[in-house]
Amino acid sequence: TALALTAAGALWCSARAVGVLAGADSGPVWSIPGTLFGGDTGSMDGLSALFVVIISVGAVAAVLYSRGYLAHCLAEKSPAHISLHYTALVAMFYAMLGVVLSDGGFSFLFFWELMTVASFLLILFDAQRREVRRAALSYLIMMHIGFVLLVIGFVRLDAACGAATFGALGDYFRTQPGLPLLLVFLAGFGMKAGLFAICLLYTSPS
């Protein structure tokens, strides 16, 4: 099931991405009329299309590889445990797609949080080990510190420009002092990217 869901999404998104890379107009991927930050859309341009292809290929490869990698765990873990792991893996794939396709802050933050929760569940695969539980909890705390910083950044952007979209960032930096917002976003994204050593202290070994 995980392979089918991942492959279906990968094929559909990759086909659309190849069209965009070839010069076709993809149109909106989604459009939400009213959210916390106003209207919100998702779209695919050349850069996001490239990332969609990379994510899709990587996700299908990860699911295929996991079948052999987890084979020895089938006798040790319950079917529900294995199902939860694959659910998190599929959710991670679609969350990453959502992140690169989001134009607005609301949808971006939604998929960013989904990516965090999915990663948390994946880290917890060997939850019977104390060090794994500690790593997962540390990861969750650090990611939510970063999430709060991103929310602050988008709220500031919305207050200054009337829109919390990536397109509004250009207007903001042309009309407002840019360094404070830049530092907030850098810290928020840096938590996920592992720019700070404390983010990787416990999670990387697990």
Predicted regions: what is each one?
Residues 50-55, 107-115, 178-186:
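Structural signature of hydrophobic alpha-helical transmembrane segments
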Residues 42-45, 56, 101, 110, ...:
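Short conserved micro-motifs on helix faces and helix-strand junctions that flank
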Residues 1-87, 160-171:
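Transmembrane helix-loop-helix hairpins at membrane boundaries of multipass inner-membrane proteins
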Residues 202-206:
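Conserved small/polar residues in nucleotide/adenosyl-binding loops
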Residues 65, 69, 118-123, 190-201:
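Juxtamembrane interface elements at the cytosolic ends of transmembrane helices
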Residues 84-91, 95-177, 191:
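Alpha-helical multi-pass transmembrane bundles of energy-transducing inner-membrane proteins
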Residues 34-37, 93-95, 103, 181-183:
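Short hydrophobic "helix-edge" motifs at membrane interfaces and signal-peptide entry regions
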